[in-house]
Amino acid sequence: MIRIALVGVESMHAARFAELIASLEGKQRARIVGIWDTNSQNAEKFVAQYAPDAKIADSLGDLAECVDAAIITDRFGSRHFEQARPFLECGMPVFVDKPLTASPGDAAALVQLARERNACVLSGSGCKFAGDTLALKQIAKKMICADELHSGHLHYAADLKSPYD
């Protein structure tokens, strides 16, 4: 079983990852065993709702000592490099939810550290797997096959005043 750390649990992205991982538990593939957040109340609330068997770590270093992989879902991209660092230094794989970092310098440093430690680091968005997106994709495929759709654009609401980077 892969023991996973979840770092930064304020967003719904963390909840979705927790639900996905829990759905694999019957097969004993992976489990969230540790949580860390900048706000201990966020961590406690998250554990109660999504990961009741997980322990809340006092530090990222402590958490890195008891897991096999990490998922970083903190809302602030400017924190991602420092949050991923302890896990990468241990040579373990890390998934960083978008954005990878908030600056090109941090992104380069994160990739360099992963190379030096022979660790896997990856980042991306799970939006393409969201139910609404998948449903829209199926509708578009049918319309393309019926020669009713030749191109399109997908627009979404974005908060230009969001405090998150």
Please place each PLM-identified region on the residue numbering.
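Short catalytic-loop micro-motif centered on adjacent basic/acidic residues
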Residues: 6, 72, 95-97, 121-124
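Histidine-centered active-site/metal-ligand motif
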Residues: 13-15, 80, 93, 125
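Short, well-ordered alpha-helices that flank and scaffold nucleotide-derived cofactor binding pockets
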Residues: 19-23, 85, 89, 112, ...
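Core-facing hydrophobic residues within beta-strands of well-ordered domains
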Residues: 30-32, 67, 149
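Receiver (REC) domain switch-region micro-motif
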Residues: 35, 70, 152
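A contiguous active-site-proximal alpha/beta segment in oxidoreductase catalytic domains
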Residues: 101-163
